[in-house]
């Protein structure tokens, strides 16, 4: 953003603030008789001056998440409820097929004791568990960060590495490929098995599929939501004995339509042989 662009941005900001100030003044003049509607000012995507998030159209960002500033989110990735990705003083990059689960925090480092500037780089097909904290670190492809883990400035988790739940990984630590680290401070625990390495990729795939269902549900307009409420009320099931006493035969409720890759394939029921 050049000098002229920043000037226009500042003027627009002042005009908006003036309007809000006039609204507050009018409310005070009305005394106890005024009505003020409480609106949430939460923004899922928010710029910081000229730094704006870039989110792939195939990615899912939950409505209650906050993606702020210089953040790039790749194809098929999912940012879940309550997450904060804050790229205000540096860059946050999230690859493809990665999931950052509920209430996690991803931030960047502009200054620290070592004097180094660290962006946060998260690779492809990474799983980051609930309430994890990533600060100025690098997480390579197909890694697993457990719930509540904390990764500090300069940490590097190599491909197929795993950080256990609740671990605290100190600054400038490097976790080699195929190893599990845990504890406070985190230290080497053991090698991953082949099955565990395969699980890392499968976990990312499962979350990408699940995100499609959440994206479809969150995209529904109000009229569709209200119509589905009526349908659910209509098809509410009561106790079979209660229905039989009243002689009621209820309609079978419709099945919830999910993408084919969300639920495991159901075996087709074969008709019983007729003797």
Swiss-Prot record:
GO terms for biological process: photorespiration; protein homotrimerization. Residues 264-275 have a biased composition (Basic and acidic residues). Zn(2+) binds at residues 107, 130, 135. Keywords: Lyase, Membrane, Metal-binding, Mitochondrion, Transit peptide, Zinc. CDD domains: LbH_gamma_CA_like. Its cofactor is Zn(2+). Its EC number is 4.2.1.-. GO terms for cellular component: mitochondrial membrane; mitochondrion; nucleus; respiratory chain complex I. It is an enzyme of class 4 (lyase). SUPFAM superfamilies: Trimeric LpxA-like enzymes. It is a peripheral membrane protein. Substrate binds at residues 86-88, 101-102, 209. One of its GO terms (molecular function) is metal ion binding. The keyword Transit peptide applies. Residues 1-43 form a transit peptide. Its main location: mitochondrion. Residues 256-275 are annotated as: Disordered. It is found in: Mitochondrion membrane. It comes from the Eukaryota. PANTHER family: DYNACTIN SUBUNIT P25, GAMMA CARBONIC ANHYDRASE 1, MITOCHONDRIAL. Enzyme involved in the catabolism of H(2)CO(3) but that does not mediates the reversible hydration of carbon dioxide. Mediates complex I assembly in mitochondria and respiration. Belongs to the gamma-class carbonic anhydrase family. Homotrimer. Component of the mitochondrial oxidoreductase respiratory chain complex I; element of the extra matrix-exposed domain, which is attached to the membrane arm of this complex. This is Gamma carbonic anhydrase 1, mitochondrial. It comes from Arabidopsis thaliana (Mouse-ear cress). The gene is GAMMACA1.
